[in-house]
Amino acid sequence: MSEPWEIIKILESDNSRLFKEKIIAENLQSKQFQNGLKMCLDPLVTFGVKQIPLCENKKGDLKWEDFQKNADKLINRTKTGHAARDLIQDLVDQSHQDQWDNWYRRILIKDLRCGVSEKTVNNVAKKLDLDFKVPVFKCMLAHDGAKHPKKIKGSCFVEYKYDGVRVIAIVKNGST
């Protein structure tokens, strides 16, 4: 098995969905790769940092366990503000460039930048019968009520909602 940052570079090299699924299938048995994908693609996991520096080190080797332990501090907000910034800089200093820029940094910015989504990963895991799934959180978008006049019966007050909230209805005495 390749290192996760090498896998990401391979995934970047081709835009074919089938190619990406093949590469993911070959490497999804790795717990490190699974955990990294989950941290990156799970929309409910946030790190609370906006700027993640690039790495210029040619030497270094940050162990996955160390990264995960420190990432948990960011997720749980035990490190915030300057302490979080300093923690991230310490992680950068322990890593080498490929390792940090192509794997750890991309997890923290929540973007693998290789054309892989949670849907692709979940499809591959399902095909392999793995007990692994990245949660998918999709917002339902609002539709124009004017296109569905039959659904609104009687008199009512209507307020446009553009944020995805569908409807709040108050029913008095069982009648609409």
Predicted regions and their residues:
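N-terminal nucleic-acid-engaging modules of covalent nucleotidyltransferase systems
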Residues: 1-176
